[in-house]
Amino acid sequence: MKNTLFHRLKRPIAAAFVGALTTLAFAPYQIWLVALITPALLLILIHGQSRRQALWTGYAWGFGQFASGISWVYVSIAGFGGMPLAANLFLMGALIAYLAIYPALFTWSYQRFFAKATLLNLLLAAPALWLIADWLRGWVMTGFPWLWLGYSQIDSPLASFAPIGGVELLTLLLLVGAGAIAYAVIHKRWSMLLIPTVLLSTGYGLSHWDWVTPQPDKTTKVALIQGNVDQNLKWLPSQRWPTIMKYTDLSRENWDADIIIWPEAAIPAFEVELPSYLSNLDSAAKMNQSAIISGIVNQAEDGQFYNSILAVGLTPYGDYSFDLTERYHKHHLLPFGEFVPFEQILRPLAPFFNLPMSSFSRGDFVQPNIVANGHPMAPALCYEIIFNEQVRQNVTDDTDFLLTLSNDAWFGRSIGPLQHMEIARMRALELGKPLIRSTNNGLTAVTDHRGKIIASIPQFETAVLRAELTPTQGQTPYHQLGSWPLYIWVALSLALAWWRKRRTNA
């Protein structure tokens, strides 16, 4: 019986281990080749399995991937949730268990509809089904498109495909390569290993192609203020003005910058409470021919709260006034951090479901760019930068930069902020726009239009990042078309693989 049990569990156990290794493909490890190998191993592991067996093998792979890959979430739950260890572990386990459903859905559907390891099934059907599972994970329950495999390729030759089809195209190519490797191993057809080699070589060739044109005449000096404010102290009334003056003093030392940028919710107060201060800040910035952008919390007249971005100084908005129509309001809210699903049930259960600032309202999906010192910027607050379609639709022909403000202090010295920066870099590469990322305690950085970090400052330090950024003109194919070509490719791939299966079985 023990032998039978071991025989039944050995593939799921192996899959969990392989899934956990997938984290090595992402920041901070960035062994990008791992993202090609681990899905190939998953395809090999489910070869010959029943649908039910494949489902559990895929589930184990996903459990391993997310247990290691999003371990940083536990830092926030344990540090700020106010619950005992058992409750913290239960919540973390529940999140991992939920996310593992999507790899399980992939393996089950593959074995259900395309069980045979044919070339068409592995090169067309498997990548298409993987993308469908990714899209569902990025949409269901507001979505969590973290650890999409394509993000791991930001520094690989495949990165050159991102301006053409976005991070999803990179994921597709990884799965095509993984399918070829699986086919080679299963059928001992080693010539199929040429397929991932050709994909990587093509990516290298594309790296010399520029889809957009830099505009050196519009080069801009920016100063990013990293306040390094302790998250446990930030919202204490006694710390309000020390925090505000910290950012103010650091800004005074950098008035020669064209744009000064503070992080998400840098001002620990409602905007309506600070009209005199903000009016004086606006005047000082104008006097120094500069502009300041900051994250701030807002409350509308109807009582709704918003996580917002405001700009003062040299802006098209005139002298400072409390006008919420001239602010950017975060649209994609963080579950449990900024809104609580089923809050009437969950809020009474534990402090974690009743965190401060966890009752925000959404802004519109598409909003006007923030304009500072003549430069339009497409904003994304923290978690929003992981939603590629939202960022894409907020970039216009006039947009000079991508702007993301964040506060990753919730996640301490974990790998979370490093993965977050990796995702932000992908947005710059996809859209051909330089990226400005201002955070409370890191990673504060700026990238060029290829997603390469050109300046950064260390985490967990009070510091100012000075840099010069050059806007670009033009649109990448991904900016113009979005994911529609991939939707069509997925539909055609599944149709062709299904037609070939039916014809073979006839």
Curated annotation (Swiss-Prot):
Residue stretches making up the CN hydrolase domain: 225-471
Spans traversing the lipid bilayer: 26-46, 66-86, 89-109, 113-133, 166-186, 192-212, 479-499
CC per GO annotation: plasma membrane
Function: Catalyzes the phospholipid dependent N-acylation of the N-terminal cysteine of apolipoprotein, the last step in lipoprotein maturation.
Protein name, as recorded: Apolipoprotein N-acyltransferase
Any GO MF annotation of the entry: N-acyltransferase activity
Subcellular location: Cell inner membrane
Family from the record: Belongs to the CN hydrolase family. Apolipoprotein N-acyltransferase subfamily.
Membrane topology: Multi-pass membrane protein
Listed GO biological process terms: lipoprotein biosynthetic process
Residues at the catalytic site: E264 (proton acceptor), K330, C382 (nucleophile)
UniProt-listed InterPro entries: Apolipo_AcylTrfase (IPR004563), C-N_Hydrolase (IPR003010), C-N_Hydrolase_sf (IPR036526), LNT_N (IPR045378)
NCBIfam families in alphabetical order: lnt (TIGR00546)
Pathway given in the UniProt record: Protein modification; lipoprotein biosynthesis (N-acyl transfer)
Keyword Oxidoreductase: no
PROSITE patterns noted in UniProt: CN_HYDROLASE (PS50263)
EC number(s) from the headed UniProt entry: 2.3.1.269
Top-tier EC class: transferase
Keywords attached to this entry: Acyltransferase, Cell inner membrane, Cell membrane, Membrane, Transferase, Transmembrane, Transmembrane helix
Principal subcellular localization: membrane
